[in-house]
Amino acid sequence: MGVSNMKEMDCVEVIVEDDSYAKEGVHQGMQGWICDSRCINGRWLVIIPQYGEKENIATLPIKEEDLVLLPGGMDARINERIRGMIFISDCIYSVH
């Protein structure tokens, strides 16, 4: 891997749906911020927040290639919308 263009405090978006992330409640399209200055084994430690004062969805290491920078900042409301869509989808499929 070459020199990274990401750094601590950068806002990022998860661009893949990955089972290991999904187990932690993190899905493609969710946004967060890098909370550690170190990229360890090609992974950044990312906080995926909810909107307002709610508890974070997750803090987990995410592969750099699974992230894209959000230079304009992030919007935690998107994370809640995605969580809601996943919940509804899970409910629909569990009925059948």
Predicted regions and their residues:
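Basic/aromatic-rich interaction segments and small domains that mediate binding to polyanionic partners
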Residues: 2, 7-75, 89, 93-96
